[in-house]
């Protein structure tokens, strides 16, 4: 059913384009009356009624029942039919992947979190990823022909429009989307940047409550930024926006994974925290990690976060130092973008106030007062689910926007 509409949209007929706009309206508004929809789309009520009747008959739209009003006729509410299509999201992280399935309305049907996987820029790693995706597809409880798209989140530079990744899985001349599609059984596939997916997840189902100008700071093993301007994800010309972590920040002679020296990420990231903590421990400073982790080569970011939340003083101090540094750089972003909302997310945000309070203090210190008054600093509501929820939501929105 949904596949038929997508084929219509690809042909570009006026009817299909109008149906696409109606679906997009319901993606962002949930439900509405025909009168409200006609006003929003600047069309006559009879024209919209014709489209809605046809889409109800085709199974894309449902009549949700009468809207309770104070008097007169009670208009009907319409919205998306949950069962007319499904969308898969895949979040690729450093040492695991998350997979999810949503229905046409955007309700989460299934999530599978923290599936072991090591992301490497090798054909073998890509093959393993595709095997995990295929296994998930085999286990989901929906008809396979109702799965309309699979969206994969990746870190680094991603061109979502062309389907190319430039930081990982970039060894094939073909678009990565084509390669993955071939390996998982011919499904439609899209890709996007991991932090853009996080901000979209928060925008659709998280902490965002009507704000239209938002920055999301992803502090995980690396560092990243997602941007929404006037209610739309900002990608830049080729999809590379948000790479502020590779701005020059420090005269430290540390070579970043991008190949340049002194990038912000070399001092402000989970990788930086990991490196600095090991330096302190090797210099003889005390930490519960020294007692619980016999082989420091196996130390993970999760181990450090657990130590912070167990009130390990050394780990707390180092997280706070990173918070101060990050706050200075975010202050600069606020001065540039003047956002309504700044969301702090990613793995390190699980340390809570130990990270966010120093960030907030530094922002107050280094932003212009007028800018500071406009911006609210909040923690991610979806936490570790932000990326996978965003991946699923992008899987849907990419087909209808």
Label for each model-derived stretch:
Residues 1-73, 77-113, 117-145, 260, ...:
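ATP-binding/phosphotransfer module of carbohydrate and carboxylate kinases, centering on a glycine-rich
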Residues 87-91, 147-151, 214-218, 224-226:
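Short glycine-aspartate micro-motif
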Residues 101, 157-158, 227:
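Hydrophobic beta-strand positions
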Residues 111-113, 121-125, 181, 185-306:
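Glycine/GP-enriched mid-protein hinge/lid loop-to-helix segment characteristic of carbohydrate kinases
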Residues 112-213, 354-365:
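Glycine-rich phosphate-binding loop and adjoining helix at the ATP-binding site
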Residues 155-157, 220-222, 348:
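Short glycine-rich anion-binding loops that position phosphate/pyrophosphate groups of nucleotides
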């Amino acid at each position: 059913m949904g596949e038929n509409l997508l084929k219509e949209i690809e042909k570009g007929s006026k009817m299909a384009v109008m149906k696409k706009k109606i679906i997009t309206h319901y993606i962002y508004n949930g439900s509405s009356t025909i009168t409200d929809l006609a006003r929003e789309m600047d069309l006559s009520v009879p024209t919209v009624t014709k489209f809605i009747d046809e889409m109800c008959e085709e199974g894309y739209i449902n009549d949700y029942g009468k809207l309770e009003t104070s008097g007169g006729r009670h208009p009907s509410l319409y919205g998306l039919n949950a069962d007319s299509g499904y969308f898969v999201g895949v979040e690729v992280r450093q040492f695991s992947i998350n997979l999810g399935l949503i229905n046409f309305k955007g309700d989460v049907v299934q999530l599978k979190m923290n599936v072991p996987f090591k992301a490497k820029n090798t054909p073998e790693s890509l093959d393993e990823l595709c095997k995990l995706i295929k296994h998930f597809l085999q286990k989901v409880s929906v008809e396979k022909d109702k799965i309309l798209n699979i969206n994969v989140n990746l870190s680094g530079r991603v061109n979502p429009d062309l389907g190319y990744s430039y930081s990982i899985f970039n060894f094939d001349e073909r678009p990565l989307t084509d390669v993955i599609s071939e390996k998982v059984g011919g499904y439609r596939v899209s890709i996007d940047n991991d932090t853009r997916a996080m901000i979209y997840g928060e925008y659709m189902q998280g902490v965002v409550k009507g704000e239209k100008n938002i920055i999301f700071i992803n502090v995980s093993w690396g560092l990243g930024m997602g941007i929404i301007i006037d209610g739309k994800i900002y990608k830049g010309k080729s999809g590379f926006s948000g790479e502020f972590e590779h701005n020059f920040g420090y005269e430290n002679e540390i070579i970043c994974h991008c190949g340049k020296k002194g990038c912000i990420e070399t001092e402000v990231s989970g990788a930086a925290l990991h490196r600095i903590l090991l330096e302190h421990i090797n210099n003889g400073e005390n930490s519960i990690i020294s007692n619980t982790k016999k082989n420091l080569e196996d130390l993970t970011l999760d181990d450090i976060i657990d130590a912070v939340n167990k009130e390990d003083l050394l780990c707390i101090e180092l997280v706070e130092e990173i918070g101060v540094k990050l706050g200075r750089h975010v202050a600069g972003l606020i001065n540039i973008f003047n956002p309504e909302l700044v969301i702090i997310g990613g793995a390190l945000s699980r340390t809570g106030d130990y990270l966010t309070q120093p960030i907030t203090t530094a922002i107050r210190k280094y932003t212009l007062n007028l800018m500071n008054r406009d911006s609210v600093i909040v923690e991610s509501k979806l936490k570790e689910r932000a990326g996978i929820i965003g991946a699923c939501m992008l899987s849907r929105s990419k087909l209808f926007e």
